[in-house]
Amino acid sequence: MLFSPTIYTSLPSSLFLTFLTKPPLKHTHTYAHILYKTMSPFKIFFFTALILAAFSASDADFNTDVNVAWGNGRGKILNNGQLLTLSLDKSSGSGFQSKTEYLFGKIDMQIKLVPGNSAGTVTTFYLKSEGSTWDEIDFEFLGNMTGDPYTLHLMFTLKEKVTKSNNSISGSTQQQISTLTQSSGTLKESCKLKISRFLPDTLTVDDTPIREFKNSESIGVLFPKNKPMRMYTSLWNADDWATRGGLVKTDWSKAPFMASYRNIKIDSKPNSNWYTQQMDSTSQARLRWVQKNYMIYNYCTDRKRFPQAPKECATS
């Protein structure tokens, strides 16, 4: 699989600031690792999040493992628990959440995005811990006009209490990577995303690494490894910012919009040592190739926003 050098206008930085908070007595970092442009709104996307549930490996059942959390009937579990659908109309969107929290292990799930004109809509899959100092990892698929690519907006939010100062610190870090296609140049049928949260935090698309976020706690960089997270998905309207910075609004004549989730698989492990695979030299070379040829924006080189590069940039 190759990244297509598709040119597009990047979304404004202010989009990421909506995810930042400045609560008192908190130390906050937000990592918006990837804006990744997918090729087609009709395709199915495969997610692998390396996390841990309180149960063992299994082909999970939506009836058993999740609750439809909101939407007043717009979220439905079908096919004996094997399919979950979310819908969005002008009144409301919908979403579900897992019954169990996760820390170490793996979740696989297939997601089919809103087809056709999905402008203004956001389809999500994310992990979030409880409490006022939560960690969060977000996949947000930002809809677009018919035939135009989706944009994958990936956020990391990490928080901890500040013990020696009443000041709070906020940060937003971003990268943008252009479109993925088949080696023949045709549109991809699907992409498989993987997150390893524990050794380096490695993001891959179809086994091609596109981001490595190493555990750099030794130099004062927060890393998400201590707080169990609950799994969430949602479909909602964000036409004030989601498509071309809010210039393209949701076409409600196309409602209801529908996204679907299936083939959820959950694996659990007793501790963080179960996943020990490091990037080999080939993977590291592929990562550098992607960054060189298809990275549109890299927060590590944005001196206007970060006169001094964030600490993790030295090791990523």
Which positions does each model-derived feature cover?
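Classical eukaryotic N-terminal signal peptides for Sec-dependent ER targeting/secretion
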Residues: 1-50, 56
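GH16 jelly-roll
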Residues: 40-316
